[in-house]
């Protein structure tokens, strides 16, 4: 008999009366009146093993095993006694009567119980090998595998070719910082780890591969959040001779396919499409969570002439905004709740949080409860009530500041209230999945510090055809052929139609204040390639880590990556990054400059 004939979790009634050989880890050992029970675990689940004292040598071995010992057992599959069936296990109707038990490897006492749900992330990541034995982590990584497999199946059926692109490439410092790799052979020169395969996949389109994809690692040296890692995985795709709508349709179908085949979820037959400007106006975000049934109300124009400077000053400022968020039944919120929300929005730069409770709308200002009502004239109050559609029992929150502060703070408040216990109890948030496309992004954003425009996505995104003329006259008016797929408030994919004409690409570089010499030094290979009959092309990249995180209901993408980094970009398991030998540095022609120590 081979070392293993079945997986533990797959031993069911179909094997009754048969002798099986199983391998796995001891989840738990119990001694009941001289009979030893072992819960044996492998990647497929648990099976109960019964060790009878009649088999002396085997029983003596069973007395010595402990949690996480790696063992092999041979035994007979039989029904569990009446009243001992475990409906929670696939193998719960049977047990294995042990005939032979071999300890393949003993284990020291684990630093934690695998069924402890209150472990700190530091403990889990330090002992990641043990953490990965936990059923939830096994589930998450197998789900990740299934998502990748289904993506490959779909793309293969659509004629896409899996092509690898370089991991050691040229540094083009636009946007996030590059991870740099020093070259030993070329002293004083550096490779960069790719932030994406963007330029190489465009070159593959010029090279007539027509449809490309790869599931690949990307690297960005940036500050980390719950949904960011220094190295992350993209489902990266590019295609020739398709327009923006066709590209969106193609990859919308892919996401529908993946959700149906992996977690049996039917996403909308057609994803709604929302312009960037509408998303910002209604939700203050370019990745709105449509499950939350709260929206902004625009009040900037109605607050220009009020005596309340908190509102009128931003209302009259060039980059100012005044917006309201009506919360149905929010009159129930206590002053303590409101104070908590006020402190919350300060995180996003807001100076405070104005509010009005609507007690009796029919009484006008006399039916309103708020410290700010006395500062507003009747016309502004009427505009607030009419535009928000407020009813008795509602509360209206206000944000007034620079547009970015208003969008960030009120947008965060919208999500916080919607997903709160109050929001759930009052029907302010829906369950399920709410996908959409956000389109028509600005092509450029103005950087006040550098006094120049920067690319909102990347500098290879095509402007809308009707906006080509603005590249040289008014770049801020340009909209891009860019699109993001958003799901439940997460951007899970983003892409664009690319620039395929050298003269247009050069105009974009000029709009970004990248001169001809600099453009040639950084991107000459792309500009040259575009001159050889480059086809119209575009693509998209999906964040595999984010998609699996959402499907698994995980708190962080670190829960769907086998060996992730912390928020300080450290690997607690291997203790990376770490110092290297001085000899290695000399070979790379590198001398370290130690950071200055703070003065005492």
From Swiss-Prot:
Its EC number is 6.1.1.23. The record marks 32, 83 as: Important for tRNA non-discrimination. GO terms for cellular component: cytoplasm. Aspartyl-tRNA synthetase with relaxed tRNA specificity since it is able to aspartylate not only its cognate tRNA(Asp) but also tRNA(Asn). Reaction proceeds in two steps: L-aspartate is first activated by ATP to form Asp-AMP and then transferred to the acceptor end of tRNA(Asp/Asn). L-aspartate binds at residues 174, 220, 457, 498. This is Aspartate--tRNA(Asp/Asn) ligase. The gene is aspS. CDD domains: AspRS_core, EcAspRS_like_N. It comes from Burkholderia vietnamiensis (strain G4 / LMG 22486) (Burkholderia cepacia (strain R1808)).
